From Swiss-Prot:
NCBIfam families: DUF167 family protein. It comes from Dictyostelium discoideum. Signal peptide: none annotated. Residues 1-22 are annotated as: Disordered. This is UPF0235 protein. InterPro entries: DUF167, YggU-like_sf. Belongs to the UPF0235 family. HAMAP family: UPF0235. One of its GO terms (cellular component) is cytoplasm.
Amino acid sequence: MTKKGSSNSSKQQQQQQQIIINNNAKVDEPIIKINVNVHPNSKESSIVSFEDQILSLRISEPPIDGKANIGVIEFLSKELNIRKSNIEVGKGSKSRNKSVEIDISSENITKDELFERIKSKLNN
């Protein structure tokens, strides 16, 4: 009988550890979602505005076969100094209105710092 009791308590400990790990994972892996309005096939890629949590971009790539989506990722990566692998087009891959997800957990920046980087590019 002691074996059953000890296995149950070890299962409970494992479950508690797993819950703690899962909670820490949420804290350690923040994903910032930004609504982006994309104007593809522009003369040059640029940040137009960042108001009301909506980022407006001009992208030089055409909206054909996902080229504009790739252009968004490459442009944001270059301008914000964030790895391409940490930027993903979430919703709206075939729309001008998109949701871009940026994983800042390995970038050593906060959400506020990310937004400051975006705003600093508006002045250039």
